[in-house]
Amino acid sequence: MRRADSGLRSLVISRSLLEHVVRTRVAAQGDIRILEACSVVGLASTDNCERVTGVRLRQTHTSAGTIDIDDSLAGDLVGDSLAADLVLDASGRASRSPQWLKELGYRRPQRDEMHIGVAYASRSYRREPDHLEGDNGIVIAATPGNPRAGVLLAQEGGRWIVTLAGYFGDGPPSDSDGYAAFAATLPSQDIHAVIRTAEPLDDPRPTRYPSSIRHRYEHLRRMPERFVVFGDAICTFNPIYGQGMTVAAAEALVLRDCLRRGTQQIGRRFARRAAKVIDIPWDIVVGGDLRFPGVEGRRSLKVRVINGYLERVHLAAASDPAVGRAFLAVANLTSRPERLLVPDVAARVIRGTWQRTTGARTAALTRR
């Protein structure tokens, strides 16, 4: 992608710092308590199971020993259940809400799954001023011809975070030489040029992501009152696209609006509105992954037409910054996909396809 101002601002910090700041601010609120050394093992409900009344807890252990749940809850614990006016499941991909609903006599939501077999590993390196000619990062996308990807981003403390990934279980090795060799197979050598000389600060941390999953809670005709499923507990996206946190933030705004209308049927109301938030990024992720021949799934006419047009968008963006800005806005969910079809952008895409361009699909994060 041609180097130009994208119009976007990115916060490039480590996950640990972000979680520390968020957790600290939440804990500073006088009416919020964070319970540790315990886990939720089920839902508590009325006798007829029509309303969720809390969660069932189980004590766990930490290196500091077992924390007395009864003391920390100060009377809110009834037996093994914590009473609540509203229960929100934000437990992520491992959510057990489908099973918990079944235990209360409700149907499980329909589950859509796209098997992709993404394997990736992240590693930190010492950052030097001359790396990437001073840019703050680079993203190298996977393509059907080379289903490997990489991202290198600046973080606090003078560090780079590098993530290398591949489809169909083809992830990077966990040894230093193998990790660097994997980076050398990417269609651009920018990441490899940095890590082959940079000082590593830790070992590669491998992770596997077998599939993108969407639970269709919006299709359920019945849900218990006072119960909401949220974020990755509804839908988990291929992490290569980096859309999970953006979708969760958008869902938080939807939840705020739903709560302003009260808690009656809050679960179903939120699920229906959240589905509209999820639809676009889900289509982007599923459609993008169906470009790879090894991914199983129905390639409808709509998917084939959209993917064909996006290939032309990528080609045009290599030489036209206006097309690049439009694509990045859609990919980062700050604009709707229709932005790529407005006459000015479409005309630029058509002109761009006349210019025979080869090379990696990359995007650089520059200093501001």
Language model region names:
Residues 5-24, 35, 90, 96, ...:
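Short beta-strand to alpha-helix junction loop
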Residues 28-188:
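Predominantly flavin-linked oxidoreductase catalytic cores and closely associated redox partners
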Residues 17, 21, 25, 100, ...:
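Amphipathic alpha-helical segments that form well-ordered structural scaffolds
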Residues 1-2:
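Glycine-rich active-site loop/strand segments that organize a redox cofactor
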